[in-house]
Regions:
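Residue-level detector of functional hotspots within protein domains
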Residues: 8, 27-29, 86
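Compact, glycine-rich, soluble single-domain proteins
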Residues: 15-66, 71
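SAM-dependent methyltransferases
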Residues: 1-11
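C-terminal structural segments of small proteins and small subunits
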Residues: 66-103
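Non-catalytic helical/linker scaffolds that mediate oligomerization, partner binding
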Residues: 11-19, 75-79
């Protein structure tokens, strides 16, 4: 098997399970977690493809997810590329699984 280029995107499908969906505190924790890694990390849903390292982008993303929550549509994708892309996605997956440490 050949190694994956650091320019290739790695994706992780995420399903929100916390009762309040995304709001300011989870958005902030996403930014804090993603910012620990060199990889470019993005949150993708519908027409949005936003930086997971930008609090303004994550607030916009959270607002979009809240609007989708009324339709029981709580899935989105984190994608990353760079030298530690897989580690960044693993950390974000753990963060979501732990419900952002808020429940």
């Amino acid at each position: 098997m050949s190694p994956v280029s650091t320019n290739d995107w790695v994706e992780r499908r995420i399903s929100l399970r916390n009762k309040h969906h995304l709001h300011m505190r989870p958005a902030q924790r996403i930014v804090e977690t993603a910012s620990r890694y060199q990889a470019e990390v993005r949150a993708v849903k519908d027409h949005l493809d936003l930086s997971a390292k930008s609090i303004l982008d994550m607030i916009e993303f959270a607002a979009h997810m809240v609007n989708r929550a009324s339709q029981d549509d709580n899935e989105f994708v984190f994608r990353a590329r760079g030298p530690d892309a897989q580690q960044a996605l693993d950390a974000l997956d753990r963060l979501v699984e732990e419900r952002f440490g808020l429940e």
